Each structure stands twice: as structure tokens, then as C-alpha cells.
């Protein structure tokens, strides 16, 4: 009989739950729930398990917040809980809660050739460190290294580092955002809300009044060519994504590749390919050639967080990925 476990990917907007086949790692019965519709993560899990009519003994859930100890409090959501208490309440033998980008990073070793698109650089070097980051409701970051036959994810909160500027345009943008926000982290620019901040900052720094637009409206207007300011904002977003990725690559010498996840970039992949992303990625002065050799991939798998949560759980049970 097939043995399955519960896996989850919980962000600031949605909670995705699915079943993972422990033998093959395949993901099935995926459902998405709005975080606004439920008082707690436990409530969402109960609804999902009732819908599947299954009793599950093990679960691994990636959540968009730092994981340090038993108490979990989400960064971009009001949910907070005790891991131990939730495990007891759900009657689980094993409940593992990990950072959402720990989960995404653990998907990388099990991605298929059709699950990613390469954007420049050479061949990924086996055994070398890997970086992964992604823009969605927030900005997630992790690194991945291989030790013998095990993969080790290095979680962190890299999305909250200071955002530096490299041009006069970026100087003006960050200065404008600093007046509004105080501390300007990378996440304040490289996320869905960040795209809105870029748009507002560019227009305001030109002494004009910006429209009230959503991230999707900005990207749609940019792609259709109907709004010059939206096009400017999306173009600069791509450049800043490149600068940030180049910093990640330098931090750990990620000759295993830099991977882009998250819900934003796949929506405008062709625009992203043609943007200034790759030039900005390698724009590191004396280390330009160093960066030009490093491959960058956009993850196109629809659910890397679920896939990676399953991989993390399977490896913790002694299964080689």
C-alpha cells in the first residue's frame, strides 16, 4: 500500500497542502486555501484532511517566517502557533515545520529538466553551493550545499538585508522610499508589494502623483505597453533582481547555480529574459567574469515548495534524494 504524508507551503497569502508519496516523492491532491479565510494553520490542515478522508502520521510544512524553536509567528500573516501543540492536536507522530525557502531549496535536487529555464552562464558545477531566492508576497532566500549523499539547506532571512543603489535613478528611488518606510530592505523592492513601491517611488521622484495599482496591474500594463511608468517599474524590478542575485552568488561562490522561485517572475518570463537582469547580475566590477560563468535558472515547476517539503521529509527518514 502506498505510504503518503502531508506536505504544505504556507505564504503570506495562501496555504497550499498536498500529499507526498514517500517512495517516489511525487506530489498529488494539491489544494490551495486563502489564509484570510481561516483562523489558524491547524484549521486549514483539518479541512484538508477531512476532504481527503485520510489519517496522516507525518507532515512537513514550509512557512514564510524564521523557524527557531517551538513557537512559530508568521512575518506577513497573523497566524502563530506551537509546533508541539499543533502536532498533538492533529494526532501526528511527526510534524516538521521549516522555512518556506528551506523547502524550495530542497526541491532543487529533484527538479526535472523541464522544471527550470536557464538564463545565461555556463554549466552548473556538481558539488558547489547553490543559491535560491524568490519574490512573492515577500522575498525568500536560502542556500543549498551537498555533503556526501545528503543535501543541507542553509536558511536565513536574506530578504531583509539593506538594499543598496548603484545608479542615480536607484539613489532617487531608495531615498524616496526611505522617507516613507525608514529602513529599505531588499524585500521592500523585490516582492509583489515591492513592485508597487518601485512604481510609486519612480513616479513620485518625478514630482507626479502615482495611480493606485496592484502588482498584477503594473505588470499587465507594462507587458501590454500601455503605461510607460509601469514598464519602467517592471524593468527596474528585473535589474534589481539581477543585482541581488549577483550578491548571493558572491556570498557563497554559488557555482552550482542561482535559482529564482516565487510567484512573480514566471508571470512575465519572456520580459524577464529580455530585461537587464543578466547584465546586472554580472555587474560586479573586477568580479564580472567570475559572475558571468555562474548559471541562473528560473524554476518553472508549479509547486516547488510542496515538492521540496516532501524531499526534506523523505531525506529526514533516511531516503537518498
UniProtKB/Swiss-Prot annotation:
Pfam families: Glucokinase (PF02685). This is Glucokinase. It comes from the Bacteria. Keywords: ATP-binding, Cytoplasm, Glycolysis, Kinase, Nucleotide-binding, Transferase. It is found in: Cytoplasm. The keyword Nucleus does not apply. GO terms for biological process: glycolytic process. Its EC number is 2.7.1.2. Gene3D superfamilies: 3.30.420.40, 3.40.367.20. ATP binds at residues 8-13. GO terms for molecular function: ATP binding; D-glucose binding; glucokinase activity.
